[in-house]
Regions:
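An acidic-aromatic loop/edge-strand motif
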Residues: 25-33, 40, 46, 50-59, ...
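Accessory beta-strand-rich segments of carbohydrate-active enzymes
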Residues: 37, 64-169, 199-200, 356-357, ...
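Extended substrate-binding grooves/exosites of carbohydrate-active enzymes
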Residues: 51-59, 100, 134, 139, ...
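Aromatic sugar-binding surface patches on proteins
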Residues: 110-112, 232-243, 658-669
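Extended acidic/polar, glycine-enriched regions
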Residues: 120-124, 193-286
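Surface beta-strand/loop "capping" patches
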Residues: 163-200, 606-640
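Beta-strand-rich binding/interaction modules
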Residues: 187-227, 237, 632-654, 677-684
Length: 698
């Protein structure tokens, strides 16, 4: 599939033909080629998606300011309604067409349409977009532990409409909303909503056709309705139907997707078409037994993920998303927290098709000060509304997140003043009610890091509370077991509880061979400690079946300008060398930012979650040297039933089962090197193998 055009219409058709072709009365083109300048003097050619922090984002001080993008497009019929559709312009954007300002959008991650009809002319037109990623105390995020990149980091489209069309200004990117107020194994009720515009100077009679299409393309349901629309007017279309025996969307086991399509006709002439993928499912959270999908227990276990990549920042392409989701599928996760802001729509399309359940959230992060203005809270509501309107149809989304860690740093006099807990409680209640008015069916909650110790936090108006826990990393030194003790207290206070973050910094190129030295080290971030951290947390998670979802922090390393840690490398555990490339990074990822190195813990979780293939993986494999006279403690992550270990071709041990609670951590008996360079091989019962080489440390 060449590409999915996310706005307007026939997703399957558009992917197969030229983006600027005539599509049943709807003309659209992706605007990919732009010129870019930071100073308005020197210009360079760039391709959208583009972030002007793609290179300097991984540094001590990345550029925060404005920059201008400009391009040209041709209009053949200036009387027709035209829209620019931005899938994300960070962090705020002023849009001009032929020098006329047509939009001032505040928020860097949600899609928005701009009606440019009054500003265009027949022939060549110029569009200019001024992006600005400076801190703005009235726009979220104000402060956060991730970079606030700037630019047109998501695609941009130009769309020309017929005289009557489905409005892009009411129901987001797909121009229609598909609600399922009742889903049961034997019956599904569906409500389809869209707004039909008539821009002509006469009343018209149109036919709106609604279709439900099976995954194989066959027609499951169809209905036509005649609608009279007055001149220069609109019509709120709503169609409800009930179908029995539908195929449910059942997570990673069976992510079955239907297509809902609406077509607009005047006589036999089709004027417009819009469609969206939908998946029918029902679910609930249980305070004692966890998450249920379609009536059955379905524990959600997975990872969090930023929209970020080395050399691109937030400007990922569809191929980048496909690669990342292949990695998620390999991992075997059935849950994703897409943090800390709405990601590009294509990311949710991937989750839909793979059956991965998602929490997505607005970037209200860290800051709620006593001097916060009403404009700040208005922006929070605006971004929530845009997120829900644009992403509503995705079956993968079961959780809307309102905020993250409103109890930590970032609240000071240089920003909005000191922390205002009363405002958090009050504004959370208002935001919750607003989100529920937009979507009464999904769960709405928050991600806290205070262990609900703030007065009033136990009374937050939420459907669920998630905790970000770093016992043994940021606090409770050398006491990883404090994680479950804290969670037990939180669970008793809150009922429905999740873990939205847990993790430790891991430099995959920093190692120690001595078990006594496997401790937290701010400069080194030993991989061995990261392994121990995740192993301990998972053992504790196994004892907390009431957790609805857990998400390890985080799938990929990502840059943070203010961080300087985990930058000392060692492949022998004795000599260490500074690696500047590891600075200014949050390295809690299971995979490095460039996607080139899967850390040990990636294979730990793969062994736990991926049941479709056998995993056999030596840990500490990037430790290349070891003292000859010391005991070597080889450890393997594997979901095999038996493992046989060989040293230099000779069998030294055979284990039946790992002998511990996770069933995937295999610790072999101590042994010692026999030559200057020993080879170790482990073989599973089905023949799957892994091999490492260790040289004598001199």
């Amino acid at each position: 599939m060449r590409r999915n055009i996310l706005f307007a219409a026939i997703l399957a058709m558009i992917s197969a033909i030229s983006a600027n072709a005539q599509i049943r009365g709807l003309r659209q083109v992706e605007l990919k080629d732009w010129q870019f300048s930071k100073d308005g003097i020197s210009w360079e050619d760039v391709t959208i998606p583009h972030s002007y922090n793609a290179e300097d984002g991984h540094s001590k001080a990345y550029y925060r300011g404005d920059a201008t993008y400009k391009t040209e497009f041709r209009v053949n019929d200036a009387k027709a309604d035209h829209f620019l559709v931005f899938e994300g312009a960070a962090q705020k954007a002023i849009v001009k067409v032929n020098g006329v300002q047509v939009a001032d959008h505040r928020g860097g991650y949600t899609a928005f349409p701009v009606n440019i009809t009054e500003a265009i002319k027949k022939g060549i037109n110029e569009v200019e977009v001024i992006c600005d990623n400076r801190r703005d105390l009235d726009i979220i995020p104000v402060e956060s532990d991730f970079n606030k990149n700037g630019g047109l980091h998501n695609p941009v489209f130009l769309v020309q409409m017929e005289k009557a069309y489905f409005s892009p200004e009411s129901y987001g990117l797909y121009r229609l909303r598909v609600e399922a107020p009742e889903v049961a194994p034997n019956k599904v009720a569906t409500v389809v909503k869209t707004k039909v515009m008539n821009t002509s100077n006469r009343g018209i009679t149109v036919n709106v056709r609604t279709q439900l299409i099976e995954a194989d393309g066959s027609l499951g349901y169809q209905a036509d309705r005649k609608v009279d629309i007055k001149a220069f007017s609109d019509y709120d279309y709503r169609h409800e139907f009930v179908v029995s025996g539908l195929h449910l969307w059942n997570g990673v086991k069976d992510p079955y997707l239907y297509t809902v399509r609406v077509e607009l006709f005047e006589g036999k002439r089709m004027l417009d078409i819009a469609e969206t993928k939908v998946g029918y499912r029902y679910y609930h959270m249980d305070p004692e037994n966890g998450f249920y999908l379609n009536g059955k227990p379905y524990p959600l276990r997975g990872v969090a993920m930023h929209q970020d990549m080395d050399g691109k920042a937030t400007a990922l392409t569809h191929d980048d998303y496909r690669r990342d989701y292949r990695m998620i599928k390999e991992l075997g996760a059935n849950f994703l927290r897409l943090a800390h802001y709405p990601h590009n729509d294509f990311s949710y399309q991937q989750a839909d098709s793979l059956g991965i359940i998602v929490q997505t959230e607005i970037p209200w992060v860290n800051v709620c000060g006593v001097n916060a203005r009403q404009a700040y809270f208005n922006n929070i509501h605006d971004q929530m509304e845009e997120m829900i309107n644009n992403l509503f149809n995705h079956p993968s989304i079961c959780f809307w997140g309102m905020w993250n860690e409103l109890d930590s740093w970032g609240n000071n006099d240089s920003l909005q003043g000191g922390f205002d807990a009363d405002a958090v409680i009050y504004q959370t209640g208002k935001l919750y009610e607003f989100a529920k008015s937009l979507d009464p069916w999904r769960n709405v909650g928050v991600s806290d890091d205070s262990a609900v110790k703030r007065p009033g936090y136990t009374d937050l108006k939420v459907d669920y509370l998630s905790e970000n826990r770093y016992n043994g990393w940021y606090y409770d030194a050398d006491n990883l077991d404090a994680f479950s003790k804290d969670m037990e207290v939180i669970h008793k206070k809150m009922g429905v509880t999740n873990v939205s973050e847990y993790g430790a910094g891991i430099n995959p190129f920093s190692h120690v061979w001595d078990p006594a030295r496997v401790k937290k080290d701010d400069a080194c971030h030993f991989e061995e400690f990261g392994n121990m951290f995740h192993e301990s947390y998972w053992r504790q998670i196994l004892k907390m079946p009431w957790l609805n979802f857990t998400s390890a922090w985080v799938l990929f390393d990502f840059p943070v300008s203010g961080r300087q840690e985990g930058y000392m490398d060692s492949d022998n555990g004795e000599t260490f060398k500074e690696n500047p490339a590891r600075k200014h990074m949050n390295d809690k990822g299971l995979v490095t930012r460039d996607r080139q190195t899967k850390k040990d813990v990636f294979y730990f979780y793969k062994s736990l979650w991926n049941k479709s293939e056998t995993t056999v993986y030596f840990t500490s494999r990037r430790l290349k040297y070891f003292p000859a006279g010391e005991d070597l403690h080889l450890k393997v992550y594997s979901n095999a039933k038996t493992l046989t270990l060989y040293q230099n071709g000779r069998q030294v041990e055979r284990m039946k089962g790992s002998g511990e609670s996770t069933r995937v951590i295999w610790q072999f008996a101590p042994l010692r090197l026999k030559t200057d360079q020993d080879t170790f091989k482990v073989v599973a019962d089905d023949g799957t193998t892994d091999e490492i080489t260790l040289s004598r440390l001199r």
